[in-house]
């Protein structure tokens, strides 16, 4: 595959550097791996990518496989009008970790293609029961906004960003203070009542 310089860097990041994957270079990020953040983190990333989980993502059980018809459809035609994710959800991984691991595996095994600004990847799980492999995931996305969203969550202000997003999702008006060293981390208002939030680390965990 002949890639542009930008797409070449994107593929390398997806293969080696995205958080929490099985790679020596990968960093750890609790906002991506911890179940307590999972729903808001995944929804945030979907929005940043211009996707909706209810419309564009189909989860299947970890013992299920993607139908041969769906697999052959995505292998045969690459539409660049929409992004889609079909993936087996494992109980040991968060939604984001499932997505990132799937993308990384499809690249590592060479079962992917680049069309314009899309990557489409396929994830087959080796099995003695099926010599062709078990069809576990199809990913057709624009990787650049995915990496941008991950970078924001991994930034020093990632926790504040995600908490502000979560509070807005449940109806709070969120104001970020002008002076964080002196004020609280977030100022909230809902139904005429005002609240303040301060984020603290305790024994390695953030609250």
Task: Label the model's feature ranges.
Residues 1-158:
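Amphipathic alpha-helical interface elements
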Residues 96-99, 178, 189, 204:
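Generic detector of ordered secondary-structure context
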Residues 102-105, 161, 165, 195:
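Active-site-proximal helix/loop capping residues that flank conserved catalytic or ligand/cofactor
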Residues 115-116, 204-206:
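Short glycine-rich, flexible loops that bind phosphorylated cofactors or substrates
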Residues 154-178:
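Acidic-basic catalytic patches of nuclease active cores, encompassing PD-(D/E)XK
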Residues 167, 186-188, 192-205:
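Conserved catalytic cores of phosphodiester-cleaving nucleases, focusing on short active-site segments
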Residues 180-183:
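Short acidic/glycine-enriched loop/turn segments that link adjacent beta-strands
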């Amino acid at each position: 595959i002949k890639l542009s310089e930008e797409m070449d860097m994107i593929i390398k990041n997806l293969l080696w550097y995205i958080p929490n994957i099985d790679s020596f270079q990968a960093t750890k990020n609790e906002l991506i791996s911890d179940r307590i953040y999972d729903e808001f983190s995944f929804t945030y990333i979907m929005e940043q990518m211009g996707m909706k989980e209810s419309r564009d993502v189909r989860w299947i059980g970890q013992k299920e496989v993607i139908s041969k018809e769906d697999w052959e459809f995505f292998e045969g035609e690459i539409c660049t009008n929409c992004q889609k994710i079909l993936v087996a959800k494992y109980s040991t991984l968060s939604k984001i970790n499932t997505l990132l691991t799937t993308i990384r595996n499809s690249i590592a095994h060479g079962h992917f293609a680049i069309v314009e600004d899309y990557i489409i990847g396929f994830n087959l799980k080796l099995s003695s029961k099926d010599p062709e492999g078990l069809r576990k995931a199809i990913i057709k996305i624009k990787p650049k906004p995915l990496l941008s969203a991950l970078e924001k969550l991994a930034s020093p202000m990632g926790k504040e960003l995600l908490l502000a997003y979560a509070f807005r999702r449940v109806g709070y008006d969120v104001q970020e203070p002008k002076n964080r060293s002196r004020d609280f981390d977030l100022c909230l208002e809902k139904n005429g009542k005002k609240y303040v939030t301060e984020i603290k680390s305790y024994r390695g965990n953030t609250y």
